[in-house]
Amino acid sequence: MPVTIKEIAALANVSRGTVDKVLNNRPGVKDTTREKVLKIAKQLNYQPNFIGKALVHSRDPIKLGIILTPDYNPFVQDLLTGINNAQEEFSAFGIEVITKMMTSLEPAEQLSIINELVEANVSGMAVFPLDDPQVFSRINHLIENQMAVITFNSRIEGIHDLCFVGQNHYKGGRTAAGLLGKISDPDIEIGVIISSHNLSCHQDRLHGFQDKLAENYPNVKILDIQENQDRKEDAFRITLEYCNKYPNLGAIYLTSGGITGVISALEIAEKNPRVKVICHDITPDTIRFLKNGTVDFALGQSPILQGYQLVKTLFEYLIKNIRPQEIIEIPVAITTDESL
């Protein structure tokens, strides 16, 4: 028979209320007592009655808040697909997902959305955090007040999240540089386009790219680095500027969304396929460009799986009392025309 909270309380010589606090990760219990109760529960293979809890919450759902960056990036649209898939799967267990889409990459907007979700009484939150001290402070304040917060896609030191879901973007940048080095002249000249310096994932990709080039391909030259905020129109403008300004442009490295803008500019400048193109995220447009040879390779990060994992992780923590591992890493997937 499954062990009960009453039995654990008797063996630990504490009240059932104390055991309930420990198993539901609530404050008000001494560390030594908490450790003792957890050890007993583990030895007895205690399994929480999450179905009973879910039946209660089906009448009063647990609300989860998810904050996404603007959806003009197809990667975000795929994230949303994964979130919606998970919401459909877990709604029967008393989960309601509130998804908020940012319209810019400005910290003030993200802070406003965080406050909206707090007002909506969410019990857990998944945030694609901007690299801003006020954002860090607000998120950490929520965590200190017992809200379950996970971050995704951009990992930022100093945020004390429940866990991080996403890719090692520094590794992704190094992978891009290594692949480019293998298919290019040793002194190739590169134009770089990143989304925003407010997103650590793009900074990490850039740093990984630069470090790998410095270590293994020291004669490669980065001509310029500009932001496009994930907008294809800005990617188009920046790429055309690179083509006009740098006659020896040999490659474009795009860490962000906007691949259609890059390819359109190269076609107008009659630089494609001579200029090599490396990008991140496997979208329908990227697949089309890989197949026709205008993109050399792309690095994927399974956004549908990532979006699903956000809801699943918060569900398991809040309903099943399963604490996630500190980092749920999404592997770097190298895609070429031959692997499609």
Label for each model-derived stretch:
Residues F75-F90, G172-A176, S200-N219, I238, ...:
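Short, solvent-exposed amphipathic alpha-helices that sit
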Residues P133-K171, T283-K291:
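Flexible loop/hinge segments that line or gate small-molecule binding clefts
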Residues E88-P107, I190-V192, L213-E233:
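Short beta-strand elements in bilobed, periplasmic/extracellular small-molecule ligand-binding domains
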Residues G124-H141, F209, E227-D285:
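Hydrophobic alpha-helical
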Residues K42-P74:
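N-terminal helix-turn-helix/winged-helix DNA-binding helices
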Residues F164-E189, A235-F236, T286, S302-I319:
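Hydrophobic alpha-helical segments within soluble ligand-binding/sensing domains
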Residues M1-A54:
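N-terminal helix-turn-helix DNA-binding module of bacterial transcription factors
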Residues C201, L213, S302-L340:
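Hinge/cleft segment of the Venus flytrap/periplasmic-binding protein
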